[in-house]
Amino acid sequence: MRKILFAALLLALTMTAALGEELPKAPVNMEIPPEAIPTQAEGELETYGLTFPEEMPLAARNFVLTARAQFEQHPFEKLPKANEYTQWYYRDKREIGWCSVFQIWCAYHSGLQLVRYKQDVEVAPGDCISAMEGRVGNVYYAFEEHGRWLQCDQVEAIPKPGYLVIYGVRGSTPYTHVAIVESVTELGDGVYELTTVEGNINSTIKRMNYRYDATPKKKYYNMSVVPEGEITQENCQYTLQKDTWYITGFCQTW
């Protein structure tokens, strides 16, 4: 038994040495969702000219501004799969998809309450929340069980800044990618123009600008490009990431 324990200790030390520099440590035990940290006061974050609904809570506003600040820090920059967001969350250098980890990082640093799927925790109607789930499907399940999920075929599925948007792939999965809604413009007839901040789009942080049809003729064809002559947002990707993607629904963070 002693030989086994010694061998295990030696292996752990060898792996630590192989990693080289010390890994950035998450401020909490990431197996357990942390309590919301105090959100920054209004005026302490760059607003980038964004305006928000009057009823939008400060933490939800900071969620958007924190995500935007990360984009401005790494605009369209190709990041490794093991990056500052994944190492903060997983506490190691694993290479893995990180779209949800990005929103978790932004939520934690904005003061949102983080919840998990199948976690016995009470969420009040006025609480600002996000899901501490690395898998996009579990983000959906976490919001659904707390009554904060808006399916796209529901009349009340109206996007708002600070919500999460979950994308699906036609003929494959309804939960392939998650992003943060930065701004929403209602165009009439159930059509909205969305600008989003998205982690891990081709290994980058991008701002995407496109149109969402809440009442499409075909259920899985609810995204379209903004006509070239009607583009008003700057520094965005204006093409759809993939033609087979569609919006599955929205997570009500607030």
How would you label these PLM feature ranges?
Residues 1, 15-26:
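Intrinsically disordered, low-complexity Ser/Thr/Pro-rich tracts
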Residues 1-7:
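N-terminal Sec-pathway targeting helices
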Residues 113-206:
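...with weaker cross-activation on analogous glycine-rich loops/strands in unrelated enzymes
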